[in-house]
Structure formats: C-alpha cells, structure tokens
Amino acid sequence: MKVTLPEFERAGVMVVGDVMLDRYWYGPTSRISPEAPVPVVKVNTIEERPGGAANVAMNITSLGANARLVGLTGIDDAARALSKSLADVNVKCDFVSVPTHPTITKLRVLSRNQQLIRLDFEEGFEGVDPQPLHERINQALSSIGALVLSDYAKGALASVQQMIQLARKAGVPVLIDPKGTDFERYRGATLLTPNLSEFEAVVGKCKTEEEIVERGMKLIADYELSALLVTRSEQGMSLLQPGKAPLHMPTQAQEVYDVTGAGDTVIGVLAATLAAGNSLEEACFFANAAAGVVVGKLGTSTVSPIELENAVRGRAETGFGVMTEEELKLAVAAARKRGEKVVMTNGVFDILHAGHVSYLANARKLGDRLIVAVNSDASTKRLKGDSRPVNPLEQRMIVLGALEAVDWVVSFEEDTPQRLIAGILPDLLVKGGDYKPEEIAGSKEVWANGGEVLVLNFEDGCSTTNIIKKIQQDKKG
C-alpha cells in the first residue's frame, strides 16, 4: 500500500521574507597556514543555493506545490543567481529590487563535511518602503491557501503586523517562523514555529514538558495566536492549540549531519500541507517526518515527495502507520509472505507516557512487526467514563504511528478488539497489566490458530489516570 500524501499539486503558497544566497566552498585540508593557526582549504568545488525565505519556497515546490516568493534584493550578481536557481526549481520570484543595498549572501567554507567558517555579506533592509511588498501580497491572496512569513530579522518583515492583517482579512492562514524575542509583532498569526531556544528566550527556561505546554498556552493567549508549534530537536516537536490536548511528536531523524535550513523545511511542509486541505495535526506529522530527512543532509536542503513518503512509511514495504482494517490485513499478508512474525497489542493510549513507550518497545522486540489497536473515542468513553479520552482518536493514532517501535496503528469501535484480532490473527498477542492470558480479548482465536498469548508488565507508577489526577491537583493547588 502506498502512503497517501497530501494533494500538493493543488496547493498554492506565498512566501514573504528575508531572501539570501548561500554560497559553499568545498575542498580538502591537509596543512595549517604559516600565517596563522588556521587550516588551509584548497577549494575545488563551489556551490550556490537559495537560502532563508528562498529555501522555504524551494521546500514547497520540491513537494510539487506552487510557491510564489516575495522578498528584497539588491541589483547584483547574487540577485541574478538567486532568480536563476529558483526559476530552475519552479519557484515564481517577485522580488523588490533595492539599488542601494546588496543581496544578502552567506559564504560557508567546508572541508571533510565540517563547516570551518561562515562569512556574511549584508547590510539589512531596515527602512526600505514596505508598500511594494504589501501590494504583492494583496494581489496573491485570492489564489493561495497559505501565507508564510519567514523572518531572519533582515528587514523584509519590518511591517509584519500589516502583512498579518492583510491575510486575516482575506481568511488566509499565516504561518510565521519567528526571529528574536518580540513576539508581540506576530500578534494574530495562525501559527508560530519557534525552535526550543527561540521559545525559551521568550518564556524562560522550561525544565519539563508540562512547563512547555503551560507557557506555550499562555503565549498563545497573550498574542492571540491560533496555534504554536515548538520544534525541539532530538525531542521532536510539540503542537499546542487552545481547547485541545497537546500533541507531542517524537523525532524521526536517524542521523543528524546539519540542521541548516531545517526550520525552513518544517514551515514549508506545514504550509504546503495546509494549503492542500489537510488538518494542522496532519501537517505537523508530515513536517516532522520531513525534518527527520533534511537534517541528514549537508547544508540547506529540500525533501522530495518520495523521500517524504519513505519517511512517513518508516519501513520500506510495510505501509503507513495509521491504517484502515482492510489496509492492515493486506499489510499483514505481505509481511507473512516475507516470513515476518506479527505481534499485536491494544489499548486506549490516551496520554502517552514513559510506561506506554517502554511497553511498546518491549512488545516490538518479540517479533518483526507490531500492530497497535486503539479504542475509538466512543469506545474509550464507555470504558473510562465521560471525561475521556483527553486526546481524540486522530491525535492518539498519529502519536503512536510516529513511535519507532510501532509499525501499524488501527482503531476499533467495540468495547474489546476481539473481532479485529480474530480477523488479523497475529502470531503473538500481548497485553500489559495483571491479566491472565485466558482473560485477554482474542486469546482463544489466536491460540486456535497456533499463535501465542503473552502478558507484559507496565512500568510501575506510570498511568494516564495518575497523570490526570496530578494535573487536577496542581490546578487546585
């Protein structure tokens, strides 16, 4: 089964922000300079790549979506190189040329895949008349599904508040990659995407995930944001929205070579996915997968649809994590043809905690593929009471599907997954807790088919109920 990517070809996004040219000089290093204690690089390769807001636009078109880029440049070779490079990848450029300023350029010198130095050539565009930028935004609003404002504090977004108001008036979502500590200037945006360092520079050091959520929700309220996405490097990313439970997604990066431009990739994929008509939760899932790909590349890079598809599939031929029952049966049949052992478990998995993660990792070690069956919202309510679930089914399944230990996630409507298990007939059925094997739903069917049933222990002290009680006690205190 192929992963269903968003319909990127129908997505139109405008990117407005600080555009720049990234230059890379590569070469071997074998000696130290006699003039100073620095390495001598014998340059043998020179590359030029669009950077800043231009890299955001390239990330959008690399997915097959349509991107129009607006920014400030000089009238120079760097501007011409930018325009040519972007035209080659189908980015529609609509630059405002400023004859008194040079195009922002950053030169990096690298040897043996290590960056030795960066040299910046820039004066910034503070004080430049923003009206031509506003006119370009106004002209495009009727034909785009999202507006990205890419802020590198170089002057293109000096009038960012007016830009936000233009988009809000037209009903177009505004996504902003912020810069600096003055988030007041982004008031009214649809989504801000700070990294953890940028976030903590505004709200203070956060020692726990709970502090990130609490301070993030206050920031949303203070600045009238619709949502906040905090990218947290090896900790993944956290989506916060008023009236909804936090959505924490673990990182999907396997190796990290260079984080240059990773933020551009995240906001580019977010915008393209939203403009294609997908939900914000889905957009974050795809952006998280794309970030895991791009940090494994050197320098500012983009992600192709094939790379994104492979990333969200996680394991080459096994399909997308979240599946329908029919899709799951096909995936299981294919796994069995390859001689793989299929393990299955089930639960509510409302607020994912360390006990869940440890349990699922241990279950996965018992076979080659792990299926997690999840109670629907109605099933959870019948099982746990009217106040549950805290997290809706879609969010619970997305988070489970992002875990490395989990291959496939499927939901069921009944009080128990007996019917579902009887249809799948895993090689091994596991359940956490104090059950006896014969008490586990589906055990009779699995045994009758020659399979095994096993009870695994949960980590002591970890439970969703205890987490909820602690939150309630903290609020009272």
UniProtKB/Swiss-Prot annotation:
<dbReference type="GO" id="GO:0005829">
    <property type="term" value="C:cytosol"/>
</dbReference>
<feature type="active site">
    <location>
        <position position="264"/>
    </location>
</feature>
<comment type="pathway">
    <text>Nucleotide-sugar biosynthesis; ADP-L-glycero-beta-D-manno-heptose biosynthesis; ADP-L-glycero-beta-D-manno-heptose from D-glycero-beta-D-manno-heptose 7-phosphate: step 1/4.</text>
</comment>
<keyword id="KW-0007">Acetylation</keyword>
<comment type="function">
    <text>Catalyzes the ADP transfer from ATP to D-glycero-beta-D-manno-heptose 1-phosphate, yielding ADP-D-glycero-beta-D-manno-heptose.</text>
</comment>
<dbReference type="Pfam" id="PF00294">
    <property type="entry name" value="PfkB"/>
</dbReference>
<comment type="similarity">
    <text>In the C-terminal section; belongs to the cytidylyltransferase family.</text>
</comment>
<dbReference type="GO" id="GO:0033786">
    <property type="term" value="F:heptose-1-phosphate adenylyltransferase activity"/>
</dbReference>
<feature type="region of interest" description="Ribokinase">
    <location>
        <begin position="1"/>
        <end position="318"/>
    </location>
</feature>
<dbReference type="Pfam" id="PF01467">
    <property type="entry name" value="CTP_transf_like"/>
</dbReference>
<comment type="pathway">
    <text>Nucleotide-sugar biosynthesis; ADP-L-glycero-beta-D-manno-heptose biosynthesis; ADP-L-glycero-beta-D-manno-heptose from D-glycero-beta-D-manno-heptose 7-phosphate: step 3/4.</text>
</comment>
<dbReference type="GO" id="GO:0033785">
    <property type="term" value="F:heptose 7-phosphate kinase activity"/>
</dbReference>
<dbReference type="InterPro" id="IPR011914">
    <property type="entry name" value="RfaE_dom_II"/>
</dbReference>
<keyword id="KW-0119">Carbohydrate metabolism</keyword>
<feature type="modified residue" description="N6-acetyllysine">
    <location>
        <position position="179"/>
    </location>
</feature>
<feature type="region of interest" description="Cytidylyltransferase">
    <location>
        <begin position="344"/>
        <end position="477"/>
    </location>
</feature>
<dbReference type="InterPro" id="IPR002173">
    <property type="entry name" value="Carboh/pur_kinase_PfkB_CS"/>
</dbReference>
<feature type="binding site">
    <location>
        <begin position="195"/>
        <end position="198"/>
    </location>
    <ligand>
        <name>ATP</name>
    </ligand>
</feature>
<dbReference type="GO" id="GO:0097171">
    <property type="term" value="P:ADP-L-glycero-beta-D-manno-heptose biosynthetic process"/>
</dbReference>
<keyword id="KW-0511">Multifunctional enzyme</keyword>
<dbReference type="InterPro" id="IPR011611">
    <property type="entry name" value="PfkB_dom"/>
</dbReference>
<keyword id="KW-0418">Kinase</keyword>
<keyword id="KW-0067">ATP-binding</keyword>
<comment type="similarity">
    <text>In the N-terminal section; belongs to the carbohydrate kinase PfkB family.</text>
</comment>
<dbReference type="InterPro" id="IPR004821">
    <property type="entry name" value="Cyt_trans-like"/>
</dbReference>
<keyword id="KW-0808">Transferase</keyword>
<protein>
    <recommendedName>
        <fullName>Bifunctional protein HldE</fullName>
        <ecNumber>2.7.1.167</ecNumber>
        <ecNumber>2.7.7.70</ecNumber>
    </recommendedName>
</protein>
<dbReference type="GO" id="GO:0016773">
    <property type="term" value="F:phosphotransferase activity, alcohol group as acceptor"/>
</dbReference>
<comment type="subunit">
    <text>Homodimer.</text>
</comment>
<dbReference type="InterPro" id="IPR029056">
    <property type="entry name" value="Ribokinase-like"/>
</dbReference>
<keyword id="KW-0548">Nucleotidyltransferase</keyword>
<dbReference type="InterPro" id="IPR014729">
    <property type="entry name" value="Rossmann-like_a/b/a_fold"/>
</dbReference>
<dbReference type="InterPro" id="IPR023030">
    <property type="entry name" value="Bifunc_HldE"/>
</dbReference>
<keyword id="KW-0547">Nucleotide-binding</keyword>
<dbReference type="InterPro" id="IPR011913">
    <property type="entry name" value="RfaE_dom_I"/>
</dbReference>
<dbReference type="GO" id="GO:0005524">
    <property type="term" value="F:ATP binding"/>
</dbReference>
